[in-house]
């Protein structure tokens, strides 16, 4: 019992001292002065980099990215997969992009000229052994057309770019040559029975 009275007696002065402190803390000495709060937000530290090779879930080679400092310092830089962006590097990157664009334009122009040449050439003649009526033995394949183009025009063409309808009869057909993603040449193919 003595211990319970001791604890009850000792807790009341403590409560009074806390209450007294709370009153003094909540009151401002001068009500006309402003109350200022300073808060600092942690900033994200990033670096601008250029990737030297393709990295899964990060980006492709030559891409300009903002990455965390730790990721660059601990992974990208030691493994040689990225470099920091400097004015000199940006200038080199711009020159390289211009060179690549010029090369793309040159390839597109060559493909357009080649398409015009194929379309104005006329028809490629394919001879096959004939059967009943207009039927032929076998069919004309993309490889046959590639061989004929090589023989008549001395031009190498990959058979994967040739889109040829199924040819099992004599007559005139139109084949497509996909010379560039933006350029397709249409060529006529005359199938003649021997």
Swiss-Prot record:
Pfam families assigned: Ribosomal_L9_C, Ribosomal_L9_N
Job of this protein: Binds to the 23S rRNA.
Transmembrane helix as UniProt keyword: no
Keywords annotated in UniProt: Chloroplast, Plastid, Ribonucleoprotein, Ribosomal protein, RNA-binding, rRNA-binding, Transit peptide
Name the record gives this protein: Large ribosomal subunit protein bL9c
Record-level GO cellular component terms: chloroplast; ribonucleoprotein complex; ribosome
Chief place of localization: plastid
GO terms for MF: rRNA binding; structural constituent of ribosome
Subcellular location field: Plastid, Chloroplast
Subunit and partners: Part of the 50S ribosomal subunit.
Gene (name only): RPL9
Organelle transit peptide residues: 1-39
InterPro entries referenced in this protein's UniProt entry, alphabetically: Ribosomal_bL9, Ribosomal_bL9/RNase_H1_N, Ribosomal_bL9_bac/chp, Ribosomal_bL9_C, Ribosomal_bL9_C_sf, Ribosomal_bL9_N, Ribosomal_bL9_N_sf
Bilayer-spanning residue ranges: none
Record-level GO BP terms: translation
Family, similarity comment: Belongs to the bacterial ribosomal protein bL9 family.
């Amino acid at each position: 019992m003595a211990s319970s009275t001791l604890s009850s007696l000792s807790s009341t002065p403590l409560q009074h001292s806390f209450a007294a402190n709370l009153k003094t803390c909540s009151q401002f000495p001068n009500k006309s002065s402003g109350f200022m709060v300073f808060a600092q937000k942690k900033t994200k530290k990033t670096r601008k980099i250029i990737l030297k090779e393709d990295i899964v879930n990060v980006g492709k080679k030559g891409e300009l990215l903002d990455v965390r400092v730790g990721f660059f310092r601990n992974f990208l830089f030691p493994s040689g997969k990225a470099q920091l962006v400097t004015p000199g590097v940006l200038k080199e990157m711009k020159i390289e992009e211009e060179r690549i664009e010029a090369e793309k334009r040159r390839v597109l122009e060559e493909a357009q000229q080649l398409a015009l040449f194929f379309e104005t050439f006329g028809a490629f003649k394919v001879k096959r052994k004939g059967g009943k009526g207009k039927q032929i033995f076998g069919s004309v394949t993309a490889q046959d057309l590639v061989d004929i183009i090589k023989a008549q025009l001395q031009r190498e063409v990959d058979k994967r770019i040739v889109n040829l309808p199924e040819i099992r009869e004599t007559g005139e057909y139109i084949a497509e040559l996909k010379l560039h993603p933006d350029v397709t040449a249409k060529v006529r193919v005359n199938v003649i029975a021997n």
